[in-house]
Regions:
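Solvent-exposed loop/turn segments at secondary-structure junctions
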Residues: 8, 15-18, 43-48, 68-71, ...
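Core dinuclear metal-dependent hydrolase active-site scaffold
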Residues: 107-141
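Cap/insert and terminal regions of metallo-dependent hydrolase folds
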Residues: 14, 18-20, 155-180
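Loop/turn elements at helix/coil->beta-strand transitions in domains of secreted/extracellular proteins
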Residues: 6-7, 33-36, 58-60, 119-122, ...
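Active-site neighborhood of phospho(di)ester-bond hydrolases with catalytic His/Asp-centered motifs
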Residues: 11-13, 36-44, 63-66, 127, ...
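PEST-like low-complexity, intrinsically disordered acidic/proline/serine-rich tracts
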Residues: 70-71, 124, 158
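Conserved beta-strand hairpin/beta-sheet module of binuclear metal-dependent hydrolase folds
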Residues: 1-26, 136-150
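Active-site HxH/HxHxD metal-binding segment of metal-dependent hydrolases
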Residues: 25-113, 133
């Protein structure tokens, strides 16, 4: 979560709107600023199915790389059914997920920036294929803070069902080159 002087950005939405509401409540403990932006680090259901909760909260944009958007078009419904079926423990209050999909409203190729007011620029980049072909990072360059989605896992084995084994090491090298 990035909190600027005028707005908030959430990276990944949680697996269900009910779970997203928990995040929204926690954000409200810290700031009353509007949650204007949601960034999807990739297309997997556990990261995107909570998106509708942010629209209800007033989010203006759901941002995804063009490759992530294309994967949602190609596999979104299938991934939704598959992940809910295979990993029900990850989808608390699954009944809160609305029918269909909540779509990104803004896509990008390569890089983009979002200003959360006058003081905080969040840089967004698709650094290469790894966990999926649409992997996206968000970072604060000067502070050396990075959200890398599932490109980087901590004390966990990465899910590799959609990965690009040959590309992933190069993508991680590129990510390491940012100096985070």
């Amino acid at each position: 979560i990035f909190i600027g002087d005028e707005a908030v950005m959430v990276v990944d939405t949680q697996a269900t709107p009910a779970m997203a509401q928990d995040v929204i409540r926690r954000i409200r403990e810290v700031t009353p600023l509007p949650i204007k932006y949601v960034l999807l680090s990739h297309y997997h259901a556990v990261r995107v199915l909570g998106a509708s909760a942010y629209f209800k909260e007033g989010a203006e944009q759901i941002i995804a790389s063009r490759d992530t958007y294309d994967l949602i078009v190609e596999r979104g419904e299938q991934d939704k059914a598959s992940e809910i079926g295979r990993f029900p423990r990850l989808f608390r209050n699954v009944e809160s997920v609305p029918p269909g999909l909540t779509w990104p409203t803004m896509t990008f190729d390569g890089t983009m920036s979002v200003w959360l007011g006058k003081k905080l620029e969040v840089k967004i980049a698709q650094v290469g294929r790894g966990h999926t072909k649409g992997d996206t990072i968000a970072y604060l360059e000067d502070q050396k803070i990075c959200f890398a989605g599932d490109l980087v896992e901590y004390q966990s084995t990465a899910y590799a069902g959609d990965c690009y084994f040959r590309d992933w090491p190069t993508t991680l090298d590129r990510l390491a080159g940012f100096g985070f």
